Amino acid sequence: MPQTLADMRRDYSRSGLCEAEAPLEPFSLFHQWFAEAMKTEQLPVEPNAMSLATVDGNGRPHCRVLLLKGVDERGFTFFSNYESAKGQQLRARPFAAMTFFWPTLERQVRIEGEVEKVSSQESDAYFQVRPLGSRLGAWASPQSRVIRDRTELEELLALTEKRFLDQAPHCPGHWGGYRLLPDRIEFWQGRASRLHDRLNYRLEKGGWVRERLAP
């Protein structure tokens, strides 16, 4: 018989997550897990792919998949068009949540916090290392706006290519980076019988508090 959605499941038995072996702050654990994901989640899977959830001014949630482009003790960095739908949502409510899922490792990381724009210098530095086509696309595409058809987009790209025929495209003012400043990071490790390990880090005035959550 064909498998139904109700029948689709897998058991997890690869590893565990113990408080005694976990660091007191979350960033070193994220770096460790991400390094392991880089080794196991082979292309075409992108280990730095994440879902990013935002909320608009009416309280309606929106979610999409983006690529993480930087992480340090300040937070998690991604780039976008500031005039896009997500840009408008972050302007109205500067908070977001992101989730990484690495199925080979049976792991998930959830991150929540306030979002700020990175400096123009950071945005420009990243923009300059992007492929030429991506840089031209940032100028050409009116992201999230309704367009007539694919032909209109190709026409906009052709105009942009003509504009920058004799010069390298610089970072447009409507494009740049955001940094999510985490106040909560949860590490999830799949375990047998759905009794998963969940270690949650929440930021308090005195620093990070580590706690185990029931699955």
Curated annotation (Swiss-Prot):
Its EC number is 1.4.3.5. Its cofactor is FMN. Binds 1 FMN per subunit. Pathway: Cofactor metabolism; pyridoxal 5'-phosphate salvage; pyridoxal 5'-phosphate from pyridoxamine 5'-phosphate: step 1/1; Cofactor metabolism; pyridoxal 5'-phosphate salvage; pyridoxal 5'-phosphate from pyridoxine 5'-phosphate: step 1/1. Keywords: Flavoprotein, FMN, Oxidoreductase, Pyridoxine biosynthesis. Catalyzes the oxidation of either pyridoxine 5'-phosphate (PNP) or pyridoxamine 5'-phosphate (PMP) into pyridoxal 5'-phosphate (PLP). Homodimer. This is Pyridoxine/pyridoxamine 5'-phosphate oxidase.
